[in-house]
Structures are given as structure tokens and as C-alpha cells.
Amino acid sequence: MSSYFPRRLSARALLLPLLASGALALRAQTAGSALPPPTVLSPLVVQGRATDLVGTAATASQGIVGAHELAARPFLRRGELLEVIPGVVITQHSGGGKANQYFLRGFNLDHGTDFSVNVDGMPVNLRSHGHGQGYADLNFLIPEMVRQVDYNKGPFHAEVGDFSAAGAAEFRQFDMLPENFVNVALGENRFARLVVAGSQRGNGMATTGAFEFTHDDGPWRLREDFNRYNGLVRRTWSSAAADFRLTAMAYRGTWRSTDQIPLRAVEAGTLDRFGNVDSSDGGESERASVSFDGTWKGATATTQLNAYAIHYRLNLFSNFTYFLDDPVDGDQFNQRDRRTLVGGALSHTWSALRPGGGASETTVGAQVRADFIGELGLHRSARQVRLATVRNDEVDEGSLGVFVKNETRWNAWLRSEAGARWDGYRFKVTSDDARNSGKRLDDIVSPKAGLVLGPWAKTEIYANAGFGFHSNDARGTTIRVDPADGVTPVDRVTPLARSRGVELGVRTAVLPELVSTVSLWALDLDSELVFVGDAGGTEPTDRTRRYGVELANFWRATSWLTLDADLTLTHARYREDAGAGTRIANSIATVATAGANLAQGDEGWFGGVRLRYFGPQPLIEDNSVRAPSSMTVNARLGWRTKTWEAALEVLNALDRDNYDIAYFYASRLPGEAASGVDDLHFHPAEPLTLRASVTWRF
């Protein structure tokens, strides 16, 4: 624990440096001269993966994806927006309103741990969350409003802190849409979707708004009755010297869940593949946010300020073991999360020419965040009626991160990037059991470094190394007794867990219209205790090592056809064998994706087809139980004019009986032994599904 992080620093006090620095930056930029007249905003065109990034990228595995690439893909669920990142797999084990399951680089990231997601500077990952640490629910995003996705992998970027060991993604939304539009979609299983969005310019400003409603019952025997409402309003002002945007977003979702089911019951014919054991599982969630972004531009320097306030609420009912713990009322449990989080970031970047040639760019920045969690509850329930409280907490969690990075071009063939960040955390837990209340402080320093050789023939070679971390649930940092019985002593978790990574890679655009990257990487995570949100206690995890190779290719074959193909191979193991084995459950060793998109321009045919494969995976440490591989093909075909567009989507076009996800653990059905049955539990992928849409652009 560092003495540099004041013991009396409250979460609210963490906001003061940001606000003061922002005021100084604004005064410095505006003192002595008025801002120039506003300029007219124009729609921004992003090339996406066709942009080779040679000469600008810091690692081989980072990249960008543009709006036109997102628009060409058929999506089953909102989290699949992240599948545009090579190697990322998105699945679901419950209802559509719950955050998806994320997989990358041999990690089962659960609902977001070790993968950082931001939207226009606002964090999506929720720390000390009621269901799981780093919970990242993307249901509040409207896909048509995303103009670009920036992504990177590994702990190599100083501006990214918590939850970024495996990687990070930043969604950037349109300031002004290329066209106003209305989209209506209908599909099987009572799927219906309406999106209305548009932009308007006037008085030197641009205003953009969007609304979405989605209903889906899914193929489940229990109608999912998933209703999603999304809204967005953005006001943007731009001049030669500064850009400002103010954004408000809102989301609400309600659903009924078909959670994972036991394979034994399906094979015995007593449970349908799309059936359920507990028909009362489900939930509701809401999110509302306001954010501000400002950029002040000088001849050789840029200052950026971001601030946000977010309200969030989740009420979730789940039952994964059925009647194992309670043979009468069942094992359903209720997780509740109600919070407000505020924060922001300030950075200043300046560039200079080096004596003798070359250039250097330095960025210093600070990031602050405070989560005020008024309710963090875990309760036993039956048919959504609360029976008992396992634990109920209030949590204040604050953090301050400071970073610096420098990129220098030493000569025509050598670039370097070096940086470091310091993060300090304060945890305060007020529990219904005073023995589990308390305060903790912790901090961590994470250095990063990288070299880039080239370009030669539009080819660069990268070498990167860095340290990263993720925070753990605040409740685990102060726990002393197991809330399940109120007696058993429990060890407290490490507040901040260390990760270490290296990567070697090549990026080339030597062949016309073809961008290819290959990266070799390794990532170590320390052993730690982690808080288990489903149980309210802690459990140990051993040290892990993951390494692998990634290949990504994007080819603009003609003016109307693009092809892409990506392959990821990963080796993931525990570094010590404690007797159970060294395999990491749900670590996917092989991920392959490929796609073809065609578009004849503003008018004519358009469409695409995508294949996603992920290989078999261990479900327990000794590798004696494995989940099968999964292959999914989605397709889209349509016709457009300058004002109208019609399209047909086919999801799971081969109608394969895939598992979306599988686990191995003990559960109990009525009539089974009290000790339960060890079994594979799975959530099936949705079968072949048709959806049609019509879009009017104006």
C-alpha cells in the first residue's frame, strides 16, 4: 500500500483534481482571444479495417473498424458488435437483457473482466457489480449510431487501465449521421425492431437523435419477452480551435430467462433442448448517462477533457443448480445493483521535432472515477419472491489514474513508445454484517514499452511489453466471514491483481488492397482470491499463463467486394498443478472467422456472409470433460435505392445444434440424490432464424 494515496481521500474528493485541471485548461485555451467562428460539421468517413495503420499503430494487434463494416454484418445480439475484433467470441447463457459472455486470448472473460469497454470515454465495465466483476452490458448501444470501434489487445497502452489485460475497445458514435433514416425489422419468434434516427444542422451546431425499440421472444419454450428501449441525443459544436459534444443516453430492458440446462435431462427426453428448469428466472435493467467531451486544438498541442455521470440499476433472478441447496423452494437467487457513477479524464498532448530529424509526441493524462453503490444485494428467492438475504451492502469505490506516454520516431525505420501509469483505489464497504464492513486502499504502477521497426515495403515489425491489472470486487477486500453461514472465516482478496504481457508482431500492406497482421503473444496473471458474486464469498485462483498466435487479413478484392479471414490459436494453462489438473475451464484454443461483403454502391445489390468457428474446450481442470466445437454461418442479402433499402437476414443458416456455452458442475433435479449430479450444463444456440428489414433514408 503506497503512502502516496491519502488515507482520508474520499471518492468525491477524487473529482477535484479533474475539475480544477479542466477549468485551468479551458482558461488557458481561451485567455486572450475569442474562439474562431464555428465550422459546419460534415459526416465523418472511416475506412475501418482497410486502413493499414502502417506508420501509426503501436502494436500489431490493434486496429479500427468502421461503420460500413458494422452495417454489413447480421447481428443476433448486441454484444456481437465486439466480434468485429479478430479473435473475440460473444455468447450468452441466459436472457437477452443480461450482459453477454466474452472470450478472447484463452480467457473466459465472463461478462467483461480483463476486457475494458468504453463508449465515447464512458466506462461500460462495472466494478464491484452485483453479478460479476467488470460486468459490461452493451444493450444500451444502438448499432447504427456507432461510427467506429478502436481496439487493442494486451497491457501495452498507458492510457488504458482497469480490466484491460486481455484487451480494450472504444466505441465512437456519430456526431452527425450521413443520412436520416427509419428502419423496421420483423422476424421469427415475434422479433420486431424499430429504429428512428437523424441529424440536423443549424446555428453552427449539429444535433443528432436516435430511438430504438426491440422485442424478441426467442426460440425458447418459455417466451423470453425481451423488451429493449434505447434513446440518444447528442449536441455538437466545432470550430478550428475546439470541438465540444454533449450526449445523453438512456436504456431500459426487461426479460425472462432460459438459463443453462442439464444435458442429462435433455438426453433422457424429460426436458426440451430449448426448455427450462426454473420458469421464473429473468430480470430488468436500466442505464442513463450524460457525458461531455471537449477538445482544444493548437498548432503543436491538443487538450482533451471528458466528464460523465451514469445511473445504473439491475434486478436479476437466476437458478443454475435448481434444487441442490434447497430441495423445497429451489436455488433461485436474486442479485441487485443500484448505483451512480461519475468521473472523467483530462489529457494534454504535445509534439516536437527532434534535433537532427525525427519527431516526438508526449501525452500526460489523469482519469478519475467514483462509484456510489447504494444497493448491492444477494438474496435467496423462489419465483422472484425474496426468502432470505445472503448479504446486502453499500459500496463507495473511487479511483485515480495518472499516465504518461511518449512516442518518438528516431529515424526513418525506428519508432518507440514508452509509458507508465499509476492507479490508486479506495474501497469502502458498509455491509449488513458489520464484520464484513471496512475500508481498503491499494495502488499499482504499470510500465509499458514498445519498439517499431520499419516501414519497409509497407511492412512494420513490433515488439511490446507491459504490465497491467484488474481490480477486484470491493466486498472481497473487506470480507472476514462467509455470509452463507456467518461463522466460517474467509480470507480477503487482493484489491488489485497484476498481469504481465509481451507481444511480437508484423503488419503489412505490401500486397495491393490487402492488410495482414500476425502477432505472437504471452500473458501471465498472478494467483489471487476472487469474490464470487453468485455466492457472496471468495475463492482462490491459481497463477495462469496464456500464449498464442493471431493472424488477421482484410482484402478489398474489388470496388464492390471485400474479404476477411482471421485465425487465433491459444495455449492456456495454470502454471502449477495442485492435483486437479492445469487446464483452464472454458479457455478456447481455436477461433476462426471469415467473411465476404458485397456492395454495388449507393444503389443495387448488397449482402454478406460470415462464418464463425470456435473449437472444443475443457470444462474442468483435468480435461476429462470438454465442450464440443461450434460453427455458425450468418448471411444477409438486400437491395437498395437512394432512399429505400430492403434486406433479409439468415442467422445460423446451417441450422446447427451448437452450444452457445457449456459448464460442468453439480446440480439437482426433483427426485435425484441430495448430493446432486455432476453434469454438463449448456445453453443452446438459437436455430435457423429469418429476419427481414426495410429502411427509408431521407
Language model: regions and residue ranges:
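Extracytoplasmic beta-strand/coil segments of soluble accessory domains associated
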Residues: 62, 79, 83-126
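Face-selective signature of the C-terminal outer-membrane beta-barrel domain
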Residues: 243-251, 283-432, 454, 514-520, ...
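C-terminal beta-signal and adjacent terminal beta-strands/loops
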Residues: 613-620, 639-698
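Short acidic/polar hinge/loop motifs at secondary-structure boundaries
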Residues: 123-153, 171-172, 266, 493, ...
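Short strand-turn segments of transmembrane beta-barrel domains in outer membranes
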Residues: 150-158, 167-200, 211, 216-220, ...
